[in-house]
Amino acid sequence: VQRFLLYAAERLHSAGYYLSGDVFGECANPYVTACGQYWPAISAAVDAISGMPYPDHYSAQGDYKPWEHPYDTVHMFGAAAAARQAETASPAAVRTWIQAYNAIREPYNTYGAEEVAAEVRALRDTGCSGGFMTWNGGSDINKYQSIISALS
């Protein structure tokens, strides 16, 4: 993955473009994932790295359901991402994807402005200040209108 990103960055930079890389939220953890995404290597190769720590994508641990704790879940990601950035010689900006859709698992809780604001606050509290992007695969304009207050 890194070799391709270095090649792509060289080509894109010479044409005046930037390169970003999206990675699973899990990749911020201090181990090498089976998916071939190694945070420090990708962060060193791109201009912006975008983790995807959607709370509903994390596994339940006993009674703990990450999708019911958006602040805590994204805070854990942000702290891990900050640690990985610190070990990267020339890290990219961290621009994180956040969940802006209703949880897809039982109890199918609704993600509204409060949950999105919690995710944004968690990123800021951990120093992930390179911005964020909202993921709403259904591109539901009503959802965006309902969370707009959380995006400032």
Which residues make up each language-model segment?
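Short, well-ordered secondary-structure micro-motifs
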Residues: 31-33, 61-63, 107
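Alpha-helical scaffolding segments of alpha/beta enzyme cores, especially the outer helices
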Residues: 3-10, 14, 37, 41-44, ...
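Short low-complexity, flexible loop/linker segments enriched in glycine and/or proline
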Residues: 33-38, 65-66, 146-150
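Glycine-rich tight-turn/loop motif centered on a GG-T
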Residues: 1, 63-70
